[in-house]
């Protein structure tokens, strides 16, 4: 019985040591890149993709990250390469205004504080992100004012009218 109790205490100690808390990233250095949809003619939504390369001073790797964009949270996926992460989201073209979108990145600890503040209707702006990436979206192009089909039809009608009137003058 004593062996079972000591085994249980040892297991509890190991589990608490493993799940205590992941090491925080100190002085993160990022190299961001991003893509946004620019053509609204061939897509139904505007897509935003942010890729980052992250290195920490204390060499923390493969940490879980979360992104916050205008009050909406998204999970950040890890790339195959160490230190590569990506987050993406989409908005309807009407909602995706041209301008700068601030993408705030959080580690697990600060993300849990953010979610707790949201649940309690507290001010979330006081929770500092691990880092922030600014995404410049120039807006989407909705195509020409006049579609090519309409333009071709109008040109065809004008040519038909000119040919018909020329034929009438020749026969008269």
From Swiss-Prot:
Main subcellular location of this protein, as a coarse class: endoplasmic reticulum
Transmembrane segments: 144-164
Disulfide cysteine pairs (residue numbers): 25-56
Recorded topology in the membrane: Single-pass type I membrane protein
Signal peptide annotation: 1-23
Keyword terms: Disulfide bond, Endoplasmic reticulum, Isopeptide bond, Membrane, Signal, Transmembrane, Transmembrane helix, Ubl conjugation
UniProt keyword Signal present: yes
Domain of life according to the entry: Eukaryota
A Pfam short name: TRAP-delta
Covalent link (Glycyl lysine isopeptide (Lys-Gly) (interchain with G-Cter in ubiquitin)) residue numbers: 72
Lumenal compartment residues: 24-143
Coiled coil regions in record: none
Intracellular or extracellular location(s): Endoplasmic reticulum membrane
GO cellular component: endoplasmic reticulum membrane
Segments on the Cytoplasmic side according to the record's topology features: 165-172
PANTHER family, per database record: TRANSLOCON-ASSOCIATED PROTEIN SUBUNIT DELTA, TRANSLOCON-ASSOCIATED PROTEIN, DELTA SUBUNIT
Annotated family: Belongs to the TRAP-delta family.
Free-text function comment from the UniProt entry: TRAP proteins are part of a complex whose function is to bind calcium to the ER membrane and thereby regulate the retention of ER resident proteins.
Subunit details: Heterotetramer of TRAP-alpha, TRAP-beta, TRAP-delta and TRAP-gamma.
Protein name per Swiss-Prot or TrEMBL: Translocon-associated protein subunit delta
């Amino acid at each position: 019985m004593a062996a079972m109790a000591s085994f249980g205490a040892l297991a509890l100690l190991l589990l608490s040591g493993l799940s205590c808390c992941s090491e925080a990233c100190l002085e993160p250095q990022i190299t961001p890149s991003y893509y946004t949809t620019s053509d609204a003619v061939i897509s139904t939504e505007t897509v935003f993709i942010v890729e980052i390369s992250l290195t920490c001073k204390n060499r923390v790797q493969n940490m879980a990250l979360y992104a916050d964009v205008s009050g909406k949270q998204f999970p950040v996926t890890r790339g195959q390469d160490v230190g590569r992460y990506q987050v993406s989201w989409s908005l309807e073209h009407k909602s995706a205004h041209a301008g700068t979108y601030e993408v705030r990145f959080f580690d697990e600890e600060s993300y849990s504080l953010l979610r707790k503040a949201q649940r309690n209707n507290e001010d979330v702006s006081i929770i500092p992100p691990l880092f922030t990436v600014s995404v410049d979206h120039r807006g989407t192009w909705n195509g020409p004012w006049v579609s090519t089909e309409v333009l071709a039809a109008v040109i065809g009608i004008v040519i038909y009218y000119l040919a018909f009137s020329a034929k009438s003058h020749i026969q008269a």
